[in-house]
Amino acid sequence: MDLRELTQHDVATMWSINEQGLPGTGQVSKQEMADLLNFSVLSLGVFREQELLGFVICLPPGTRYGSLNYAWFNQRFEAFMYVDRIAVAQQHRDQGIGSMLYEQVIASSDEQGVPVAAEVNSTPPNPGSMRFHERFRFKEVGELHHQEKSVMMLLRT
């Protein structure tokens, strides 16, 4: 498996993988996925030959991204690397791909001297994602309630 930066050529496959992770990943259109890639400070994919197996998109503070979760971090922290989404193709889960991606995110944030920001659904609950983030020493720093769901806001310093 190889890690590489994502490009606009990867958007259709990224979108498909993202759809497999709903509702945990949050639904976006292909155009919104392309926009996220343009906003990103870090966008990595894990590939086996030419097949995209999983990806992560991280945003810096201050972009035009309209997510309420992202805005929550923007209002409270000056510097961070926001994990907007991490997704692994259904048939490739439980193979360490998510961990491989997060290790790169953490290494990049450590190089920049900024914390990693993320959120996990609390309603409906996503216990697998919470355990995953706890393994990487994320701590809860708040909770945000939306109409149909709530999310725990996490930070890794």
Annotate each language-model stretch with its function.
Residues 143-157:
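C-terminal "cap" of GNAT-fold acetyltransferases
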Residues 57-85:
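Conserved acyl-donor/pantetheine-binding loop and adjacent beta-alpha core of acyl/acetyltransferases
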Residues 1-14:
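A short beta-loop-alpha structural element at the N-terminal edge
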Residues 42-60:
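Conserved beta-hairpin
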Residues 109-122:
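Conserved GNAT acetyl-CoA-binding A-motif
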Residues 99, 122-142:
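Conserved active-site alpha-helix within GNAT-family acetyltransferase domains
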Residues 84-93, 122-123:
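A short, internal acetyl-CoA/4′-phosphopantetheine-binding micro-motif in the GNAT/acyltransferase core
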Residues 88, 94-107, 131, 135:
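Conserved acetyl-CoA-binding loop-helix of GNAT-fold acetyltransferases
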